[in-house]
Amino acid sequence: MMCEVMPTISEDGRRGSALGPDDAGGELERLMVTMLTERERLLETLREAQDGLATAQLRLRELGHEKDSLQRQLSIALPQEFAALTKELNLCREQLLEREEEIAELKAERNNTRLLLEHLECLVSRHERSLRMTVVKRQAQSPGGVSSEVEVLKALKSLFEHHKALDEKVRERLRMALERVAVLEEELELSNQEALNLRDQLSRRRSGLEEPGKDGDGQTLANGLGPVGESSRRTAELEEALERQRAEVCQLRERLAVLCRQMSQLEEELGTAHRELGKAEEANSKLQRDLKEALAQREDMEERITTLEKRYLSAQREATSLHDANDKLENELASKESLYRQSEEKSRQLAEWLDDAKQKLQQTLQKAETLPEIEAQLAQRVAALNKAEERHGNFEERLRQLEAQLEEKNQELQRARQREKMNDDHNKRLSETVDKLLSESNERLQLHLKERMGALEEKNSLSEEIANMKKLQDELLLNKEQLLAEMERMQMEIDQLRGRPPSYSRSLPGSALELRYSQAPTLPSGAPLDPYGAGSGRAGKRGRWSGAKDESSKDWDRSTPAGSIPPPFPGELDGSDEEETEGMFGAELLSPSGQADVQTLAIMLQEQLEAINKEIKLIQEEKETTEQRAEELESRVSSSGLDSLGRYRSSCSLPPSLTTSTLASPSPPSSGHSTPRLAPPSPARETDKTNHVPKDEAGVPRGEGPAIPGDTPPPTPRSARLERMTQALALQAGSLEDGAPPRGSESTPDSLHKAPKRKSIKSSIGRLFGKKEKGRMGPPGRESVSLAGTPSDETLATDPLGLAKLTGPGDKDRRNKRKHELLEEACRQGLPFAAWDGPTVVSWLELWVGMPAWYVAACRANVKSGAIMANLSDTEIQREIGISNPLHRLKLRLAIQEMVSLTSPSAPASSRTPTGNVWMTHEEMESLTAATKPETKEISWEQILAYGDMNHEWVGNDWLPSLGLPQYRSYFMESLVDARMLDHLNKKELREQLKMVDSFHRVSLHYGIMCLKRLNYDRKDLERRREESQTQIRDVMVWSNERVMGWVSGLGLKEFATNLTESGVHGALLALDETFDYSDLALLLQIPTQNAQARQLLEKEFSNLISLGTDRRLDEDSAKSFSRSPSWRKMFREKDLRGVTPDSAEMLPPNFRSAAAGALGSPGLPLRKLQPEGQTSGSSRADGVSVRTYSC
């Protein structure tokens, strides 16, 4: 663009105008015109320049946006593509490495196959001769005949398996390689497509950038303004950026080309891998063919070997036959030669003998004179030889006879052993069958006995119910007679009233008779009250009485099948009913219409008598249907479980008017009476309240008036009378069912044995709940004791479902007191354990042994006496009582054996002395109370028997933490391990049942038991000695783990003292274990060996502790080393400590305590012998250790 310059305006115009006004005016006009034209032209150029600038700015903005988008696309696309290409390159490298590894493996496999084939050829060439001679060696049974074809077969088999596995590997790798090649080809195609797309985009971007650049240059040249220059600079920058991007794209292309070359190289390598794989497959096929050829050659060799073996066998047979013939000939030759030599020697000998004979003949001729003497000597010798031969023959015959007898005896012994074995087997089978038959017959007899007892009890209850019903019927008959007499008396009064004048028929309004009967029953609200209308009054009264009678009879019919027992009530009927009837009749007689209704009154009385007769019939029918209702209720209760018991209790707590159907029935329409008056309480009821268990707790509910006011309408006089009669019946039944005097819970033990057998009568619900208790009752002599006040005492005492919460704490205290009384009675009488009855055994299990509630309930159901409990075997305990845990069975067996040994008449005296045992006789109790009278102290049996003194809770909660072994508490608590069982736990039970795997912890437990033995299992003595040694260094044997930690903390080693928690270190271990020294304690305290100062301090204080607080003494030879006895593993073997073998640990003798204590009397651990006060040193009973028997 050309830039036009405006002409300059001269400043001398004003001067010139003054000189020439015309010229000046013309110039000014021209100047103005030129200025205006120039202005218009400049305005147009300005507009054009502004438009161009706006378009250039718009284009610049668009180019900037495009540049940003391109940069974003490049920044997004190129790094991702580059990363993808690098990933693909890495994958290709990994695949190359895998291919190289596969090639190396294939080469190694090929080398292995070549080596195997060479080995096979060597074996075949080496053992060719041995293969041929194998059969010969086998037949000759040479010791070095190891068959070499086995190696050849093994080599062939291994070669075949190797080629098979190699073929599978090659196929698998080929498949994986093909899959990878396919994936790589797909990725390569995708990368090629993306590269083409990028090239297209770059070409499009270049074309788009070049066109706008040309347009922008033209505009700037046309306009020639400054902003257009700026746009040109910006486009130049954009072109530079584009050039840079082109360079980057070129670089990317180069990289892509490199990657493509690498991909081609990879493909070539993959092709080479494929070719090598093919070669490997060909080699594999060749090897397989070689293998087949080798197998065929092997078959040919085997056939050749078989033919050679056959030939060899035939040749061997021929050779053997030839050898035999040669041997025979050689033997014959040798024999002939020997015969010839023998004949020559014989001839020589004969010649010598001939010479000798000649000489002897000459000598005999010389000695012929002495021949008779020699003959006599020869005869004697011949006789002696004959005698010796006879004796020898006799000896041989005797030996033969003895051998024959010995054989016969051996045969008889074998037959006897066989017979003994057969007899043993037969006896075992017979004993098993007899046991089975006895158990089955026992079960059948027990079932039969239970059925008979149940039938007998039902018979007794029914007979007593019938007797009570007869009594009730007699009472009703008496009431009927009384009513008849009353009716006669009223008839007489009516007759007298007929004879009086009419003016005396009504008394004054304010008289006493009017006031007395002011509360008489009224008519319903709907009935008209017409005192002077006779007909209407009669009709109203008749309707009212008939309605009352019908409704009351309906009420009785609805309430009787409910099965609920009415509340207790006095048996005598008071005069309230008579007063009510008098009130009714008097009100009618005083009315004006009552004078003429005498017949109506008589009819009404007759109807009342008929209603009474109907009630008697209903009572009899109810007695007959009692059993049916009891069975129905039993089925309902057994099906509903605990809910039925709650419903039973809730229904028993209400009067009969509020139970079942009565609650749901509407009020009688014609009962216009108010609530009847309650009967006064009888003296029997008062004594029952004060001296006996309340009836509502004993299973018979007590209805005292209306229990829930406002819920039901007031009953009619007839229904109230029926309720009173049924209440009297229930009261009698409840009193007979209790079977005890009013103060039965406080009866003395002497009266327990003198009390006669009482029969019990049960109502429907009482019989229903009584059937469940038949199997749990003890002997008849103990029935009043075990069921002292309530029929459900035993079930509530050990109720695992928590039903005991329904009763108050007073009932539980009474039950515990009753059980303590049972045990006191057994203690006072000195009864043996076999003579204890069922309730006493159950009380002993619950209070003394401390068995759980479910075991106590099982024993109550299955154990009826102490004899049954004492004779239970281990399997019977598991089967009958259901105790599957072996430690629970051990607990029960030990408790039973302890009680049997304590209560037996042949028990040693040491077990019944105050110092030797907590079990005391009556005489010892009296002597002990007499000795404590000056101190004014009461010593009860609970304090002396000390129930639960050292039970499993004490062992788990107190004793184990004191030993430093609280981590085993849960296992000991689950196994119910008490102090009685501690001495009888073997290693297997400690490891498996109690999970005590650490041997040091078992040693710690052992020394804790030793401490208890030395203290004679006296818990109070243990606690007293621990309290005394709490602040002093004395009596280390009773120190607990906490006390030892406190002692360590007091030494200044507080940071190490916490390491003794759950370590098993306690005072008995320090005092009784001779092998435990300060180094063991330092190891348990985890004091490092570098801390020599702390170890020296511990050594010094430990020696002080041992010398001051224990019986251990320092060795005289060395100043700072203790005397060491043999190892505890050798000294305290478990069999020696327990006194029994592990096999005999299941069944322990009754005197297991003394045996176990005697076994512990080893030289390393001397026990303190505790003698009773009243025994002398020379007595035989004081020789052994008197061990205090405890109760847990």
From Swiss-Prot:
<dbReference type="GO" id="GO:0005737">
    <property type="term" value="C:cytoplasm"/>
</dbReference>
<feature type="region of interest" description="Disordered">
    <location>
        <begin position="201"/>
        <end position="239"/>
    </location>
</feature>
<dbReference type="InterPro" id="IPR037622">
    <property type="entry name" value="Liprin-alpha_SAM_rpt_3"/>
</dbReference>
<dbReference type="GO" id="GO:0098831">
    <property type="term" value="C:presynaptic active zone cytoplasmic component"/>
</dbReference>
<comment type="subunit">
    <text>Forms homodimers and heterodimers with liprins-alpha and liprins-beta. Interacts with the second PTPase domain of PTPRD, PTPRF and PTPRS. Binds RIMS1, RIMS2, RIMS3 and RIMS4.</text>
</comment>
<feature type="domain" description="SAM 2">
    <location>
        <begin position="951"/>
        <end position="1015"/>
    </location>
</feature>
<feature type="modified residue" description="Phosphoserine">
    <location>
        <position position="207"/>
    </location>
</feature>
<feature type="domain" description="SAM 3">
    <location>
        <begin position="1039"/>
        <end position="1108"/>
    </location>
</feature>
<dbReference type="GO" id="GO:0016079">
    <property type="term" value="P:synaptic vesicle exocytosis"/>
</dbReference>
<keyword id="KW-0968">Cytoplasmic vesicle</keyword>
<feature type="modified residue" description="Phosphoserine">
    <location>
        <position position="142"/>
    </location>
</feature>
<feature type="coiled-coil region">
    <location>
        <begin position="595"/>
        <end position="643"/>
    </location>
</feature>
<feature type="modified residue" description="Phosphoserine">
    <location>
        <position position="1121"/>
    </location>
</feature>
<feature type="modified residue" description="Phosphoserine">
    <location>
        <position position="507"/>
    </location>
</feature>
<keyword id="KW-0597">Phosphoprotein</keyword>
<feature type="coiled-coil region">
    <location>
        <begin position="26"/>
        <end position="133"/>
    </location>
</feature>
<feature type="region of interest" description="Disordered">
    <location>
        <begin position="623"/>
        <end position="815"/>
    </location>
</feature>
<dbReference type="InterPro" id="IPR013761">
    <property type="entry name" value="SAM/pointed_sf"/>
</dbReference>
<feature type="region of interest" description="Disordered">
    <location>
        <begin position="1"/>
        <end position="23"/>
    </location>
</feature>
<feature type="modified residue" description="Phosphoserine">
    <location>
        <position position="639"/>
    </location>
</feature>
<feature type="compositionally biased region" description="Basic and acidic residues">
    <location>
        <begin position="623"/>
        <end position="635"/>
    </location>
</feature>
<comment type="function">
    <text>May regulate the disassembly of focal adhesions. May localize receptor-like tyrosine phosphatases type 2A at specific sites on the plasma membrane, possibly regulating their interaction with the extracellular environment and their association with substrates.</text>
</comment>
<dbReference type="GO" id="GO:0045202">
    <property type="term" value="C:synapse"/>
</dbReference>
<feature type="coiled-coil region">
    <location>
        <begin position="161"/>
        <end position="501"/>
    </location>
</feature>
<feature type="compositionally biased region" description="Basic and acidic residues">
    <location>
        <begin position="201"/>
        <end position="217"/>
    </location>
</feature>
<feature type="modified residue" description="Phosphothreonine">
    <location>
        <position position="790"/>
    </location>
</feature>
<feature type="modified residue" description="Phosphoserine">
    <location>
        <position position="644"/>
    </location>
</feature>
<feature type="modified residue" description="Phosphoserine">
    <location>
        <position position="667"/>
    </location>
</feature>
<feature type="coiled-coil region">
    <location>
        <begin position="1012"/>
        <end position="1038"/>
    </location>
</feature>
<dbReference type="InterPro" id="IPR001660">
    <property type="entry name" value="SAM"/>
</dbReference>
<feature type="modified residue" description="Phosphoserine">
    <location>
        <position position="17"/>
    </location>
</feature>
<feature type="region of interest" description="Disordered">
    <location>
        <begin position="1155"/>
        <end position="1192"/>
    </location>
</feature>
<feature type="modified residue" description="Phosphoserine">
    <location>
        <position position="792"/>
    </location>
</feature>
<dbReference type="InterPro" id="IPR029515">
    <property type="entry name" value="Liprin"/>
</dbReference>
<feature type="modified residue" description="Phosphoserine">
    <location>
        <position position="1162"/>
    </location>
</feature>
<keyword id="KW-0677">Repeat</keyword>
<feature type="modified residue" description="Phosphoserine">
    <location>
        <position position="735"/>
    </location>
</feature>
<protein>
    <recommendedName>
        <fullName>Liprin-alpha-3</fullName>
    </recommendedName>
</protein>
<feature type="compositionally biased region" description="Basic and acidic residues">
    <location>
        <begin position="547"/>
        <end position="558"/>
    </location>
</feature>
<feature type="modified residue" description="Phosphoserine">
    <location>
        <position position="431"/>
    </location>
</feature>
<comment type="similarity">
    <text>Belongs to the liprin family. Liprin-alpha subfamily.</text>
</comment>
<dbReference type="InterPro" id="IPR037621">
    <property type="entry name" value="Liprin-alpha_SAM_rpt_2"/>
</dbReference>
